[in-house]
Amino acid sequence: STLEVRSQATQDLSEYYNRPYFDLRNLSGYREGNTVTFINHYQQTDVKLEGKDKDKIKDGNNENLDVFVVREGSGRQADNNSIGGITKTNRTQHIDTVQNVNLLVSKSTGQHTTSVTSTNYSIYKEEISLKELDFKLRKHLIDKHDLYKTEPKDSKIRVTMKNGDFYTFELNKKLQTHRMGDVIDGRNIEKIEVNL
């Protein structure tokens, strides 16, 4: 097999989607301007609002928030800076998952052949941000399906809701910052399809 040279863009995507993430639950966040500050175990996290989340989170103190954090920038600074990913904490105690959905991954293996794998994908939040969904799904594809070992070309993830609405993540670029604050109802996800 020939070794493909990966573009810088693909290497950057691989680096970003392999970053550690933090899933902070049930915190209060303080909004000033377009930044919400969370303190968790003496660690400060500043989250920028870049999209529709600007209209949802009020100035001052906000209770019962979860935040999905991926550090932006590559500095070694002590502060965590992240974008979007804020959702309301689950209203109901769920023993395990909020729901399991079918994750279908199609991967071209030759000129006219495609391998398809189907797995259960667990959703743990009633309200889930596109940031978290996108990040964890790509992480799964990196770990299980060699995403970013080669150029992603026009690979996509498509999340379909029970009402027929859908959300698309293009795998050849990072999720746009203004979408990182978009939130959907995790209970209403019908299925997730990936074309690699």
Swiss-Prot record:
Indicate whether Flavoprotein appears among the record's keywords.
no
This chain's protein is named Superantigen-like protein 11
Fill in the subunit field for this protein.
Homodimer (via its C-terminal domain). Interacts with host FCAR and SELPLG (via sialyl Lewis X).
| Residue numbers spanned by region Sialyl Lewis X-binding | 65-167
Q: Which UniProt keywords apply?
A: Secreted, Virulence
Q: What PROSITE patterns does this protein map onto?
A: STAPH_STREP_TOXIN_2
What InterPro entries does this protein's entry cite?
A: Enterotoxin (IPR008992), SSL_OB (IPR015282), Staph/Strept_toxin_CS (IPR006126), Staph_exotoxin (IPR008375), SuperAg_toxin_C (IPR016091), Superantigen_bac (IPR013307), Toxin_b-grasp_Staph/Strep (IPR006123)
Q: What is the lineage of its organism?
A: Bacteria, Bacillati, Bacillota, Bacilli, Bacillales
What's any one GO cellular component for it? Answer: extracellular region
Q: Where in the cell is it found?
A: Secreted
What does the record's free text say on domains? The C-terminal domain contains a V-shape binding site for sialyl Lewis X.
Pfam families, per the entry: SSL_OB, Stap_Strp_tox_C
Tell whether Membrane is among the UniProt keywords.
no
Q: Which family does it belong to?
A: Belongs to the staphylococcal/streptococcal toxin family.
Q: What is its main location?
A: secreted
Q: Give the protein's biological function.
A: Secreted protein that plays a role in the inhibition of host immune system. Targets myeloid cells such as monocytes or granulocytes through binding with sialyllactosamine-containing glycoproteins. Prevents initial rolling of neutrophils toward the site of infection by interacting with host SELPLG. Disrupts neutrophil motility by induction of cell adhesion via interacting with glycans but independently of SELPLG.
Q: Which SUPFAM superfamilies match?
A: Bacterial enterotoxins, Superantigen toxins, C-terminal domain
